[in-house]
Each structure stands twice: as structure tokens, then as C-alpha cells.
């Protein structure tokens, strides 16, 4: 890969900017269909306090009751761990400071935290003089914040994974005679066949240790053969590259070991909700992105080689 070294750093601001009420991971209770209408309130302060209460409760039906029809697919993302962290951030920011700002059209916007971050769903008064959150008006802003945050984080993660593979290749593992890349992200128990393993005295450190440590602070768990989204994205390894890659087509595998290179693909767990762009990166440090459309899950799952043909665009650092 290139000589550039990427830091494992995902700015806290990326999490804070996603201040939306999305608590799919707050409770194991299954939620029902969207409620018939959004809940109404006597005043903006009443609305804000109710919002805080449901955020703290983890009651998913209560959340949907606040926002009304059409809110389920907007406020719930495909990443329960991320959703839980988002709610915690909202609660902390609201309790630290909150106020309402009146807009020219008469609606009210909730500002929270010391930085006065705007809650994406405006509060509007109906003909009866009651207030309700306008989920339709906030939809685009909610998705834009979530998708933007996730994609920026995934770009950082892709770079960290590439650096981890380079570090893994620089050492010999499992008493191997030849240097090779890791075949998986999380090692099987008692082995070093993945980029992460539990540290032990006298053994080299895990290349993916810093990223896993960071992820664990957010509530993610390192488990072998697990298929759960990280920052709204799924990650898979690729074991070959196609003719459009630098150096042409080649198989990375030699005698069951990944010797000739490596590549990853990262795609959104729920297209249009947790992300839009799909990313691929290989041993040369070349990171590309492409919008695979509504069939992203099926299309990305079928990709088995790093082949940035037409439509794949380099990601500028």
C-alpha cells in the first residue's frame, strides 16, 4: 500500500452532528407499526420534555408516538449500537442546555448543548393551537446527517483496516514460515489468523487493537464470524483483484494464504438510511466509492474482487 499512514481517529463531532432520536438499540422490545398521528403538545417546552423522557425510557413505541406516521424508517437506523449512542448523546446535550428558536414561518427549532446544535425535526402549531413535530419536514436533514456521519467514519475505518493489514504482513503469525495478510477481521480463539486477537504476554500486539478498543467504547463487540454493522456499514474481505486494478487481475491467495495483496468492501447495512456509497480499498491504499443504488445489499454481497471499473470514483483525502 502507499506510504501514507492513517490514524485511527473518528472525530467526536461526527457523532454529535447526528443528534436524532433513533433508539433501535435501547430496548429488546419489538415495536409496532407507526401510530396513527403524531403526539401533540401544549407548548414547545412540553414537547422538549416529552422528547427527553422517551429518549431516557428506551420505549420504542413511545418514540414512534412522538413523531407519528412515517417516522419508523426515518428515526430507526440499521445499527442498534450506533442508535443507542446517539440517544445517549442527545440526552446529555439536552440536559446540559436547551432552548427553542422561533423561525420565520412560525415553527420552532430545538437547540441543544453548549454549541446550540439544531434538532433536525421542527415543531409546528396546528389549527387547534397544539404543537407537534413535523417528521416530513425533518426527514431529509435526518438522513443527510446520519449518512454523512457514517460515510466519513467508514472512510477512516477503511484506512485503518488497510494499515492493520500492512502491519500484520510485517510479522509472522501462527508459526508461519512466510509473511501473508490476515484472512479475516477477528481471529479464531487461540490463533492470529485475523487482524484482531486478545493480547497476551510475549506475543505481538494485534494490528486492529486500537480500532477495536475505540469501537468497544461505543458498545461494539469483537466477535469472530459475526455479521453486524459498524457505523451503519458491513465490511467484507476480498481475495482477488480484477483487470481494472493497478497491476491487473490476480488472485491474492497462494496455498491457502493471502500473499499477493488484500482488499475490503464496505457497504451500507440499509441503503439510503445508514449510508449511500459503497467503498472498496486494496493493498495500494486506493480507496474508491460508488453508489450501487437500491440493490446495494445484493450487488455488494456478490462482489468478490477489487475491480474499480467504470463508475467507481477515487475518494479524495
Show where each model-derived region lies.
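Short, well-ordered alpha-helical segments enriched in acidic and aromatic residues
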Residues: 59-71, 178-185
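Bacterial N-terminal signal peptides that target proteins for export
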Residues: 2-15
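Short beta-strand edge/turn micro-motifs at domain boundaries
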Residues: 29, 108-152, 159, 286-290
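C-terminal soluble interaction/assembly domains
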Residues: 260-317
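C-terminal motif of bacterial Sec signal peptides marking the signal peptidase cleavage site
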Residues: 21-25
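Flexible, glycine-rich surface segments
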Residues: 168-273
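Surface-exposed, charged secondary-structure patches
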Residues: 71-119, 224, 228-229, 236, ...
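Short, low-complexity N-terminal intrinsically disordered segments enriched in polar/charged residues
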Residues: 26-53, 101, 139-163, 167
